[in-house]
C-alpha cells in the first residue's frame, strides 16, 4: 500500500534506477498491514523523504538538534513559534568599556597599510606579558653599571629562541614537563637557530657582501642613537642566557610543557576531531566541481607574474645595495689614501727630504660618461660614421682624379670631353661606349670608371661643392645597387602606395564630414526655435544631476527623463569653429584698464580634459569665484568676487604644501606610501574611483556576501582560501602529469634497450649452425665462446630469456 504524499508541489518522486538499492520485505515480516494506522506510515514516509531533500546546509550541521527540528517544521508546515536556535545574550553592556578602550579614531590622509606576513618576518613570535615585565625590570636592576640593560625586543628574541629550540630537542615535553633540558644542553641549539631579524640580516649581509661584524640598518629597524650597536644572539646568550632560562623554565612547567602562548589549532590530514571546539580551521571534504577552470588559470598566471615582479624588485634592490657598498668602499679607500699622504708629508718635513711631491697629489679624475645610449644617440652616431666614410671616399676620389689629370695631356682631356659630350647629346647607350677602350688602347675597367667619374666631375665643375658631393653619393649608390635588373620606365606601373595612417585619417575625416552634414541639416530643419536634444546619446544615470523638485525614484526610468535632467548637450553650433580660433565677433575682451583688446589669441576657448594625467599642477593657488553682470547697452561683464579670508590659510587646512615642498627638496629615498606628493596626486582621483556606494546605497564589496547570505569577512576568507587551494591543486596536477611523462619515457627507453639486447643475443645463436657446418670449431673458438660445445649433435640454445640476455 503506497504511502500518501504530503504535497505534490513540495516533493518530486524520482524514477527507480538500476543503481538504487531497494529493501525487500517478506510476507512474515509485514503482519497486519491493513490494520495499522495509515497516519503512522505516512509520517514515517514523510520523515524518510525529508532526510533526502537538500536543505542548503552542510550535512554535519543538519544533525544539530535545534536546526533539525526547524527544518522538519518548515517541510511539514507545522507550528514554528516554540522552535528556535539558542544563542548567547549579547544585549548586555560592559561597564568598564571606557576604561580599557580610550581615544577616538581619526581617519588618516593616506590609506591604512597592514601586512601580517611582514610582521611575522620582521618581528619575534613571542609577546611579553605582565610576568615578563616584572622579571625584566628586576633583571635590569640587578645588572652592573657597565652592562647595558636588556631591552624588551631582545628579551622576546631570547624567549622565542628558547621556544623554538625546545621544540626541536624535546617535541614531547608535555608528557613529562619536569624533564626539561638544562641551559648547557640547549645552548648549542640556540646558537644555530636564526630567530627574528638576526637570521634575515645575516642572509642579507651575505648577498650584499658585507662582513658579519659590521653593523647596518634597514628600514624596518627601530631608531637608535648613533654609536649604539645591535647585540647579536651570541652576546645575548652569554650575558643573559642562564638568568632568563630559569624564568622560562618556571613558566614552561606551569604550562605543563605546552607553549607559553597557545597557538591556533588547525585540522591536519589525519587528525580529525569534530568534538574539539578550539579547532579554528577545518578541512572541507566535499567540494562542488566547477565546469570551467579559466578563472583558475588566470589567477595562477597573475600569481606567477606577481612572483616574477617581486623577484625583479628584490634583484634590483640588491644590486643598488651592492653599488652603494662599492661607493662606500671607494670613499673609505680615498680617506685612507688621504690620511697616508698627510702622514707622509709630515715625515718628509721631519726628515728633510726634498723630493718630488707627485705622490701627494692625485691625478684629475676623468669625467664619467654613461655607456647607456638612447635610440636617437645611436642613430646620430651611425649618421656621423656614415658621413666620415663618405668624406674619406671623396678624398680618395679627388686624389685619383688628380693623378689621372697629371698623367694625361690637356689635348686628350679636351678631345675626350668633347667626344663624351657629343655622345651624350646624341643619346648613345652603354654598348657604344664600350667600344672606346678598343680605340684608345688596352685599359682596365677601373681606369674606365675613373675617366667617367673625372668627366662627370668636370661637367659639374660650375656647380657648388655641396652639389658635387651629392652627385658623387648618387653615383656611389648607383654603382653599389647594380645587383637587380632595371626595368624601363614604360614597364614600371605608376602605383602610389598608401599607408595605414593615411587610410585611417581619410576614413575619420569622411565620418566627421558625414556627421557634421547631418547635424547641419537637422539644425536647418529645426531653425532657431529650439534645440533638439534627441540627437544626443543616452547618458547613464550616474552622470546626470537630478533637480531638487524631482523625486529620484521614478525619474531615471520615466519617458520624460530628458526634460527633467540637467544634461550637458552636444548639439550643433555653426559658430563653434570661430569660437575655437578666436575670430568670433560676438566675443569681446577688455584689459584691466577697460580698453578693448583685438588680439584673437585672448578670444580662444580653453579646452579642459579632466581625465588627462598631465594637466594637474600642484600649486598654492586657490579657486577664484567669478560673477556675471550686465551693464549699459546690454553689455555683459565678468567680475572677480572679493574674498575677506586668506585663501592660502584656508587651503593649508586641507593640504600641507610646505611639508610636500620640504620632502621633495630633501631629495631622500621615500617610500611610495609615505610620499606626500603621491598622496596629493591621489586626492585628485578620490572623487572618481573611491566611491564605496552604488545608487542603491550599499557597498559594492558587500554584494557577493549578500548573495551568498553570509558575512563579508567570511566571504573574504572563503575567496582567499579558494584561490590558494585552486592554485595548489593546479600545481599538484602539473607535477603529477610531468612525473607520469617522465615515467613513460623511462619505460619506453627500458623496453627499447631490452629489445636491442634480445636482438644482439639472437644473432650469435643464429650464426652458430652455419659456422659448424663449414668448419669444425677450433680451440680458440671454444675459448671465445665457452657456451658453445664442439659436439654438433647437441641442439643449439635458441630460447634466450631477457634476463640471460641482459
Curated annotation (Swiss-Prot):
Which branch of life, at top level? Eukaryota
Q: Which Pfam families match?
A: EPL1
User: Which family does the record claim for this protein?
Assistant: Belongs to the enhancer of polycomb family.
What is the name listed in the Swiss-Prot or TrEMBL entry for this protein?
A: Enhancer of polycomb-like protein 1
Which residue ranges are recorded for the region named Disordered?
Answer: 403-461, 751-806
- Which UniProt keywords are present, listed alphabetically? Cell cycle, DNA damage, DNA repair, Nucleus, Transcription, Transcription regulation
- Write out the biased-composition intervals (Basic and acidic residues): 421-439
Annotated compartments: Nucleus
> Would the keyword Transcription be found if you checked this record's keyword annotation?
yes
Compositional bias annotation for Basic residues: 411-420
Query: What does this protein's UniProt record list under function?
Result: Component of the NuA4 histone acetyltransferase complex which is involved in transcriptional activation of selected genes principally by acetylation of nucleosomal histone H4 and H2A. The NuA4 complex is also involved in DNA repair. Involved in gene silencing by neighboring heterochromatin, blockage of the silencing spreading along the chromosome, and required for cell cycle progression through G2/M.
Q: GO biological process: what's one of them?
A: DNA repair
Instruction: Please provide one cellular component term from the Gene Ontology annotations of this protein.
Output: nucleus
Q: Does the keyword DNA repair apply?
A: yes
Q: Membrane-spanning residues where?
A: none
Q: Where is the composition biased (Low complexity)?
A: 751-779
Organism encoding this protein: Kluyveromyces lactis (strain ATCC 8585 / CBS 2359 / DSM 70799 / NBRC 1267 / NRRL Y-1140 / WM37)
Q: Where is the composition biased (Polar residues)?
A: 785-795
Q: How does it assemble?
A: Component of the NuA4 histone acetyltransferase complex.
Amino acid at each position: 500500500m503506497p504511502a500518501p504524499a504530503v504535497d505534490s508541489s513540495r516533493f518530486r518522486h524520482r524514477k527507480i534506477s538500476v543503481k538504487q538499492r531497494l529493501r525487500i520485505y517478506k510476507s512474515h515480516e509485514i503482519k497486519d498491514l491493513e490494520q495499522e494506522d495509515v497516519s503512522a506510515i505516512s509520517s514515517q514516509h514523510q520523515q524518510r523523504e525529508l532526510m533526502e531533500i537538500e536543505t542548503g546546509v552542510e550535512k554535519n550541521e543538519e544533525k544539530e538538534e535545534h536546526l533539525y527540528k526547524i527544518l522538519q517544521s518548515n517541510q511539514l508546515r507545522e507550528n514554528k513559534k516554540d522552535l528556535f536556535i539558542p544563542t548567547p545574550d549579547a544585549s548586555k553592556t560592559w561597564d568598564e568599556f571606557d576604561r580599557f578602550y580610550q581615544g577616538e579614531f581619526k581617519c588618516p590622509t593616506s590609506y591604512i597599510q597592514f601586512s601580517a606576513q611582514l610582521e611575522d618576518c620582521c618581528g619575534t613570535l613571542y609577546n611579553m606579558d605582565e610576568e615578563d615585565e616584572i622579571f625584566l625590570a628586576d633583571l635590569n636592576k640587578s645588572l652592573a653599571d657597565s652592562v647595558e640593560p636588556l631591552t624588551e625586543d631582545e628579551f622576546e628574541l631570547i624567549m622565542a629562541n628558547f621556544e623554538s629550540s625546545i621544540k626541536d630537542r624535546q617535541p614531547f615535553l608535555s608528557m613529562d614537563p619536569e624533564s626539561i633540558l638544562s641551559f648547557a644542553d640547549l645552548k648549542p641549539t640556540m646558537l644555530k637557530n636564526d630567530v627574528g631579524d638576526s637570521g634575515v640580516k645575516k642572509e642579507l649581509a651575505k648577498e650584499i657582501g658585507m662582513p658579519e661584524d659590521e653593523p647596518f640598518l634597514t628600514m624596518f629597524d627601530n631608531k637608535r642613537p648613533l654609536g649604539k650597536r645591535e647585540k647579536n644572539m651570541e652576546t645575548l646568550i652569554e650575558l643573559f642566557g642562564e638568568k632568563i632560562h630559569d624564568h622560562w623554565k618556571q613558566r614552561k612547567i606551569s604550562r605543563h610543557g605546552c607553549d607559553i602562548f597557545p597557538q591556533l589549532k588547525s585540522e591536519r590530514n589525519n587528525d580529525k576531531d569534530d568534538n574539539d571546539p578550539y579547532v579554528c580551521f577545518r578541512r572541507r571534504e566535499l567540494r562542488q566541481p566547477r565546469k570551467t577552470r579559466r578563472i583558475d588559470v588566470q589567477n595562477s598566471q597573475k600569481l606567477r607574474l606577481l612572483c616574477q615582479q617581486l623577484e625583479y624588485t628584490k634583484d634590483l634592490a640588491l644590486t643598488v645595495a651592492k653599488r652603494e657598498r662599492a661607493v662606500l668602499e671607494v670613499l673609505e679607500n680615498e680617506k685612507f689614501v688621504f690620511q697616508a699622504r698627510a702622514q707622509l708629508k709630515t715625515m718628509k718635513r721631519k726628515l728633510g727630504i726634498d723630493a718630488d711631491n707627485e705622490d701627494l697629489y692625485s691625478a684629475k679624475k676623468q669625467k664619467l660618461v654613461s655607456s647607456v645610449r638612447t635610440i636617437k644617440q645611436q642613430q646620430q652616431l651611425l649618421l656621423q660614421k656614415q658621413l666620415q666614410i663618405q668624406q674619406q671616399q671623396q678624398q680618395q676620389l679627388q686624389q685619383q682624379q688628380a693623378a689621372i689629370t697629371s698623367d694625361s695631356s690637356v689635348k686628350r682631356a679636351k678631345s675626350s670631353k668633347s667626344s663624351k659630350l657629343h655622345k651624350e647629346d646624341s643619346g648613345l647607350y652603354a654598348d657604344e661606349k664600350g667600344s672606346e677602350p678598343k680605340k684608345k688602347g688596352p685599359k682596365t675597367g677601373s681606369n674606365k670608371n675613373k675617366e667617367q667619374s673625372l668627366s662627370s666631375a668636370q661637367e659639374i665643375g660650375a656647380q657648388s661643392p655641396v652639389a658635387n658631393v651629392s652627385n658623387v653619393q648618387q653615383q656611389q649608390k648607383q654603382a653599389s645597387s647594380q645587383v637587380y635588373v632595371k626595368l624601363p620606365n614604360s614597364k614600371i606601373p605608376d602605383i602610389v602606395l598608401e599607408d595605414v595612417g593615411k587610410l585611417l585619417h581619410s576614413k575619420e575625416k569622411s565620418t566627421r564630414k558625414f556627421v557634421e552634414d547631418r547635424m547641419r541639416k537637422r539644425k536647418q530643419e529645426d531653425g532657431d526655435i529650439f534645440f533638439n536634444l534627441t540627437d544626443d546619446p543616452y547618458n547613464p544615470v550616474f552622470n546626470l544631476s537630478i533637480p531638487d523638485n524631482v523625486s529620484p525614484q521614478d525619474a531615471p526610468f520615466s519617458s520624460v527623463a530628458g526634460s527633467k535632467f540637467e544634461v550637458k548637450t552636444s548639439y550643433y553650433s555653426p559658430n563653434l569653429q570661430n569660437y575655437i580660433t578666436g575670430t568670433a565677433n560676438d566675443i569681446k575682451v577688455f584689459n584691466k584698464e577697460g580698453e578693448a583688446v583685438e588680439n584673437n589669441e585672448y578670444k580662444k576657448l580653453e579646452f579642459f580634459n579632466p581625465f588627462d594625467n598631465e594637466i594637474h599642477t600642484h600649486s598654492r593657488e586657490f579657486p577664484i569665484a567669478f560673477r556675471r553682470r550686465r551693464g549699459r547697452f546690454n553689455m555683459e561683464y565678468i567680475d572677480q568676487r572679493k574674498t575677506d579670508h586668506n585663501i592660502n590659510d584656508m587651503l593649508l587646512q586641507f593640504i600641507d604644501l610646505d611639508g610636500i615642498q620640504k620632502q621633495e627638496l630633501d631629495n631622500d629615498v621615500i617610500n611610495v606610501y609615505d610620499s606626500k606628493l603621491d598622496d596629493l596626486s591621489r586626492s585628485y582621483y578620490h572623487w572618481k574611483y573611491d566611491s564605496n556606494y552604488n545608487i542603491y546605497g550599499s557597498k559594492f564589496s558587500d554584494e557577493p556576501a549578500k548573495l551568498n547570505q553570509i558575512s563579508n569577512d567570511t566571504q573574504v576568507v572563503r575567496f582567499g582560501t579558494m584561490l590558494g587551494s585552486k592554485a595548489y591543486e593546479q600545481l599538484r596536477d602539473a607535477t603529477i602529469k610531468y612525473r607520469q611523462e617522465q615515467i613513460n619515457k623511462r619505460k619506453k627507453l627500458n623496453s627499447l634497450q631490452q629489445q636491442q639486447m634480445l636482438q644482439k643475443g639472437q644473432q650469435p645463436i643464429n650464426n652458430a649452425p652455419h659456422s659448424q657446418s663449414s668448419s669444425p670449431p677450433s680451440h680458440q673458438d671454444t675459448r671465445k665462446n665457452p657456451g658453445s660445445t664442439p659436439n654438433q649433435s647437441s641442439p643449439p640454445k635458441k630460447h634466450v630469456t631477457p634476463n640471460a640476455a641482459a
